[in-house]
């Protein structure tokens, strides 16, 4: 698609991120043997022997498995800890239709069965729009008895979780007329959201039915099955960077709505919610400074979370 580069913090979907240069994998005494399986729609790296956990990753709007590997270099740490890693090529989704949820859930379960992966310690996570997919598909799987791959935990990395806010932010960007790329992306977003849901002023319920979170109405109906699931919400609220580079206000940033979501989940009794804001960790794999990046995640800490250490 012409606008496949769309990312979104400031509610514009951007390409992914960079490995945190300060994290280094700790060597193990014994090299764990791994099997690499590459298919058209996914890539799987699994230990040949004991598997202590399964990590399923979804990339940002235009990202496939190769880009995820480049921007989120967690393979070595996962390997050292006997964690299987499934990198999905499923992308370009700001929300999921019910049919898409079913097809994706079935696909994931088929992969897990086919590759004899354990189902008791599955974690799902994603960057940007991939985080939206992660939350929505996890909620769907847990709510459907025919699926038995319930995620034990789910995490997002600076994801555009509020579609209503995304629509309104796009209107601001066009009115502000700050940069041509921003204007073009916002025009595309208004078109795709408007065509599917209309204007949120007139059709807020349609937005609520599809979004992870609608801040203006405090709606989290698409996360109701995750009340006992471990949840991590990563974001880097660098207001100065966004002001200088996009002329974006804090209320236009993914970080603003991620924080609001964490507060709403905790208030409503969700058992294990962690809001994780970072400072100066956002860099792309090419060294470019960008707070909207995979690299804000501490990979070693994430693995410890998966292993419950």
PLM region descriptions:
Residues 51-61:
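Short beta-strand element of the alpha/beta-hydrolase
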Residues 95-116, 136:
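Alpha/beta-hydrolase active-site loop
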Residues 67-86:
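Short amphipathic alpha-helix adjacent to the substrate-entry channel of hydrolases
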Residues 17-53:
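A domain-start/cap signature at the N-terminus of enzymes
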Residues 62, 171-223:
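Mobile cap/lid helix-loop segments that gate and shape the active-site cleft of serine hydrolases
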Residues 113-114, 120-178:
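Primarily recognizes the serine-hydrolase "nucleophile elbow" in alpha/beta-hydrolase
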Residues 39-51, 109, 115-116, 219-221:
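Short beta-strand-to-loop junctions in surface cap/lid or active-site-entrance loops
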Residues 96-97, 229-243, 255-309:
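C-terminal catalytic histidine-bearing segment of alpha/beta-hydrolase fold enzymes
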């Amino acid at each position: 698609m012409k606008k496949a580069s769309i990312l979104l913090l400031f509610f514009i979907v951007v390409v992914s991120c960079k490995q945190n240069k300060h994290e280094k994998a700790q060597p193990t005494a014994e090299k764990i043997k791994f099997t690499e399986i590459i298919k058209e729609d996914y890539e799987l790296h699994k230990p040949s022997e004991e598997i202590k956990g399964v990590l399923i990753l979804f990339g940002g709007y235009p990202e496939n498995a190769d880009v995820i590997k480049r921007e989120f270099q967690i393979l070595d740490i996962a390997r050292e800890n006997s964690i299987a890693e499934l990198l999905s090529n499923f992308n370009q989704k700001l929300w999921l239709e019910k049919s898409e949820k079913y097809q994706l859930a079935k696909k994931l379960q088929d992969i897990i069965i086919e590759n004899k992966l354990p189902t008791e310690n599955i974690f799902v996570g994603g960057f940007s729009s991939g985080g939206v997919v992660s939350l929505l598909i996890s909620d769907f799987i847990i709510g459907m008895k025919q699926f038995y791959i319930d995620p034990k935990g789910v995490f997002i990395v600076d994801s555009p979780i509020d579609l209503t806010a995304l629509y309104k932010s796009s209107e601001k960007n066009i009115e502000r007329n700050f940069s041509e790329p921003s204007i073009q992306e916002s025009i595309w977003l208004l078109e795709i959201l408007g065509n599917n849901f209309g204007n949120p002023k007139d059709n807020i319920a349609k937005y609520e039915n599809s979004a992870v979170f609608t801040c203006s109405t405090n709606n989290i109906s698409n996360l109701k099955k995750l009340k006992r699931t471990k949840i991590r919400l990563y974001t880097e609220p660098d207001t100065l960077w966004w002001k200088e580079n996009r002329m974006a206000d804090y209320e236009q940033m993914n970080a603003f709505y991620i924080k609001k979501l964490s507060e709403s989940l905790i208030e409503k009794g969700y058992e294990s919610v962690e809001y994780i804001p970072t400072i100066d960790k956002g860099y792309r794999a090419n060294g470019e400074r960008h707070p909207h990046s995979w690299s804000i995640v501490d990979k070693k800490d994430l693995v410890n979370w998966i292993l419950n250490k």
